[in-house]
Amino acid sequence: MTKFEQYFDYVKISLASPEKIRQWGERSLPNGQIVGEITKPETINYRTLKPEMDGLFCEKIFGPVKDWECHCGKYKRFRYKGIVCERCGVEVTESRVRRHRMAYIELASPVTHVWYLKGSTSYIALALDLKVKEVEKIVYFHSYVVTQSNTDINLKYKQLLEGYEWKSLEEEIYQNQDENNQVEVGIGAEAIQKLLKDLDLEHIAETLRSEATNPPKSFKTPSLKFNKKMKRLRLIENFIATGADPSWMVFTVIPVIPPDLRPMVQLDGGRFATADLNEFYRRIINRNNRLSRLKSILAPEIIIRNEKRMLQEAVDSLMDNGRRGRTVVGANNRPLKSLSDIIEGKQGRFRQNLLGKRVDYSGRSVIVVGPHLKLHQCGLPREMALELFQPFVIHRLILQGLVNNIKAAKKMIQKNESSIWNVLNEVIQGHPVLLNRAPTLHRLGIQAFEPILVEGRAIKLHPLVCPAFNADFDGDQMAVHVPLSLEAQAEARLLMLAPHNFLSPATGQPIIMPSQDMVLGCYYLTANNPSQQQGSNQYFASLEDVVMAYEQKKIDLHSYIWARFDGLVDGDQPHDPIKIEKHSDNSTTKFFNNHIIKEDAENQRIVQYIRTTAGRIIFNKIIQESLLA
């Protein structure tokens, strides 16, 4: 595999010049021959099933179809590496070069890029300070445009003329033609290219900047004209900053992507299935070759113009099928996938293949609630954990001397021997895993947890972290990733562990908050419920006795009972007792609404009972244990 020892800081996407596009596709073979231009629309020969020369799958341009074998078969095998066959001109190399070698089509007439003509903002129209409809009329051969003005005939620069207007003026112009006072009129993408080339970016930017210093008086509703000028200024400044030429928005050369990215495969019945892009490229080459031939035989201007317009439409459909004009369809009236369709959307190259790559050491499963878990823990199915941590398990098995090599360790894992689970438990101790729930809309969408092995095939998640993931348990799925290096593990533990992320990055408010079932459970434990009276007004020697009586179903959860309690009672009840009883030994019993205190002769407390419920005791016990832990 080729490795590039070239380090870079960033990737920049910008306009490509025609020279740059040629540079992508052109290659100099070891024998000095320069290849790269595609001139024929043919793909493969249907008798030999080999790519046609100078066609869309040409082996001379893109490289051999079979590893270390030329087109004609004269040179085969690795020992001829780098040799160019003198018969067929194919370089003997690996076939995978066909995945990255590009080519180009030299156009007989310039064509505009549909993204810059018909995008959400028409950058060609903005740069030329024309309306989008006016630019479209010029590009698609409906109107002429003045590319060099003449003061005598009162023609303004960039003025549009209809066909009949130009014909009536043409005779007058050529009769009165003066060498110093010429007029030029153009049509199609060539005219647009000339206008874009003639732009003096520095002068336009200076003019627009001076206008920007005098904005309209009404700031609340700035005029559309002023807004357009500011947009144009931004565009011009970007052109200056990037060093791009506005005329590069008009194609003179079309890049052709590598053939293995638009393959053609033979089906069982002998028929061929091909990528849609090949059809677009074929149409462009056919129309381009026809236009070159018409130009060479000096065909009438109307025929040449029609061919130029068809070439423009063919390039438009390659870039973005259906953006303008009729959508090109294939078999069964299915619209063909253009370059834009391949790139954009959920199934496009970026979201599907680059951002949504499948990664190793990862798993995916349905989540279920794990109320017994601690906040920093998650339940990982044993089957999944064994697969994810397999390299660590194998390493530990070899270290412990249970096996001698990797093959034996893998066999041991496949047999599901009992000792494996002990080793797995040791391996996952202190090794955090990352849980991610799509869509990851903020940084809390992916957090670290310590795995606990659980039975079944579902991942168990602590209910308190659900708001951060925006997760619920109605069938949601989550992905598990294993940080492999020590640095990744340390980062996961220090920065990404769930207890370290209890504040929302958006609002700064706590995001780990009890909700739904938890709040309902807390309410139910501590609520008043007069209908439950079993065991009411009984006395218990301790809080533990109350819980035991509840578990044995001697009392109800909401029955009011009296329980001995030696701690401090803090309530909103009146401090004065409602009743005081004096005893023969000078001790007193004070009765309050919710507690009873017995004191000796010196007012020292002997015993205290509180009026509460089993539910409140359980709630208090859970809170106390959590705080002490």
Swiss-Prot record:
EC number: 2.7.7.6
Keywords: Chloroplast, DNA-directed RNA polymerase, Magnesium, Metal-binding, Nucleotidyltransferase, Plastid, Transcription, Transferase, Zinc
Subcellular localization, as worded in the UniProt entry: Plastid, Chloroplast
GO cellular component, one term: mitochondrion
Cofactor(s) it depends on: Mg(2+); Zn(2+)
GO molecular function: DNA binding; DNA-directed RNA polymerase activity; magnesium ion binding; zinc ion binding
Binding site for Mg(2+): D472, D474, D476
Cofactor mode of binding and number, as noted: Binds 1 Mg(2+) ion per subunit. Binds 1 Zn(2+) ion per subunit.
Pfam families membership: RNA_pol_Rpb1_1, RNA_pol_Rpb1_2, RNA_pol_Rpb1_3
Annotated residues for binding of Zn(2+): C70, C72, C85, C88
Reactions catalysed: RNA(n) + a ribonucleoside 5'-triphosphate = RNA(n+1) + diphosphate
Main subcellular localisation: plastid
GO annotation, biological process: DNA-templated transcription
InterPro entries: DNA-dir_RpoC1_gamma, DNA-dir_RpoC_beta_prime, RNA_pol_asu, RNA_pol_N, RNA_pol_Rpb1_1, RNA_pol_Rpb1_3, RNA_pol_Rpb1_3_sf, RNA_pol_Rpb1_clamp_domain
Function text: DNA-dependent RNA polymerase catalyzes the transcription of DNA into RNA using the four ribonucleoside triphosphates as substrates.
UniProt family annotation: Belongs to the RNA polymerase beta' chain family. RpoC1 subfamily.
Record note on quaternary structure: In plastids the minimal PEP RNA polymerase catalytic core is composed of four subunits: alpha, beta, beta', and beta''. When a (nuclear-encoded) sigma factor is associated with the core the holoenzyme is formed, which can initiate transcription.
Protein name, UniProt field: DNA-directed RNA polymerase subunit beta'
Organism of origin: Pyropia yezoensis
